[in-house]
């Protein structure tokens, strides 16, 4: 069974490709995340042994620095599980969006699956917990994360993240927010049990009420609830319903918590995301649109041509009155304009 710490200390290349430098300790109970150097990009390979003792800047001068997420040996896969892992991550691998931090490579070493991801030196949004205060910064966060979720949910079939939380939102070098760990749905076939099963996917404090029901298929609305819980924690320093998340909300009929110090629009948005009924929650696309317009809900706006038709009717009506209403062409024009279909503006 692979002991990743001892393996790193041995100085060997992971999968004959990556020099493990140090643990990033950014994951939960299913995997270890390591900073690594892609040995194939290092010109002077004699310096590989020195790499673990160098600063990030010095290592980046040697070659490509990446983050490797190595799933723990208890999640080792049999042959069927390996194929499912490859099939599922081929879908995720092909996702391309600014606000998604997708893997650049994935494989299996010593029966243990691993992912290769871009290294984000700025870390995750966990460091913003209780510190995200300015409305402009909050709207930026909402737009970036909601845009990434909207992309995933629009895939065929939809990709449900199932573990949206501050630690899974990373900050890139130009301070955009990017979702990581997406695409983790139910994958059975583990050699020592199940790998990524529904029971273990997700973090309780961010799990929507419906996630605790038996035989519930993953739905996009559960990601929206988790996003609402994430926003609440970033703004207040606490998760909205305690460590039991949506379970506590459903069992205790807890009142919706206030979000102090933010605009009414942002508070309404968070409350809508945390609605007990999944059907009452906004879509990710609606959240992204709200962030761009900095309001929630989006106010209805009648199309411009409606106003133009009204103006035309008034002008023609005035002209008809001026001419005494006896001109046939005026009557026909008025009649034709009145038959122009006027669409009713709806909320997106």
Which residues fall in each region the model found?
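AlphaC helix of the eukaryotic protein kinase fold
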Residues: 75-94
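Catalytic-loop of the protein kinase fold
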Residues: 153-171
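Conserved short submotifs of the Hanks-type protein kinase catalytic core
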Residues: 110-124, 128
């Amino acid at each position: 069974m692979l002991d990743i710490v001892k393996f790193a200390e041995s100085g060997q290349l992971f999968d004959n490709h990556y020099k493990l430098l140090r643990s990033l300790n950014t994951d939960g109970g299913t995997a270890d995340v390591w900073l690594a150097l892609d040995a194939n990009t290092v010109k002077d390979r004699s310096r590989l042994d020195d790499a673990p003792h160098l600063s990030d800047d010095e290592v980046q001068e040697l070659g490509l620095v990446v983050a490797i997420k190595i799933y723990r040996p208890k999640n080792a896969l049999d042959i069927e599980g390996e194929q499912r892992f490859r099939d599922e991550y081929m879908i995720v691998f092909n996702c391309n969006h600014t606000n998604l931090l997708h893997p650049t490579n994935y494989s299996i070493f010593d029966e243990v699956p691993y992912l290769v991801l871009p290294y984000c030196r700025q870390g995750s949004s966990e460091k913003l917990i209780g510190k995200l205060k300015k409305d402009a910064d909050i709207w930026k966060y909402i737009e970036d994360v909601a845009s990434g979720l909207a992309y995933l949910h629009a895939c065929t079939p939809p990709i449900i993240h199932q573990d949206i939380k501050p630690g899974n939102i990373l900050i890139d070098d130009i301070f955009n927010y990017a979702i990581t760990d997406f695409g983790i749905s139910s994958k059975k076939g583990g050699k020592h049990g199940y790998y990524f099963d529904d029971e273990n996917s997700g973090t309780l404090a961010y799990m929507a009420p419906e996630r605790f029901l038996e035989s519930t298929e993953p739905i996009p609305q559960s990601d929206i609830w988790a996003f609402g819980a994430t926003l609440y924690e970033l703004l207040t320093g606490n998760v909205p319903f305690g460590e039991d998340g949506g379970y506590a909300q459903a069992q205790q009929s807890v009142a919706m918590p206030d979000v102090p110090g933010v605009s009414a629009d942002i508070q309404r948005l968070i409350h809508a995301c945390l609605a007990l009924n999944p059907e009452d929650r906004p879509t990710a696309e609606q959240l992204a649109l709200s962030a761009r317009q900095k309001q929630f809900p989006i106010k209805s706006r009648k199309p411009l041509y409606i106003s133009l038709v009204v103006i035309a009717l008034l002008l023609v009506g005035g002209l008809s009155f001026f001419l005494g209403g006896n001109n046939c062409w005026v009557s026909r024009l008025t009649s034709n304009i009145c038959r122009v279909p006027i669409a009713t503006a709806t909320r997106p």
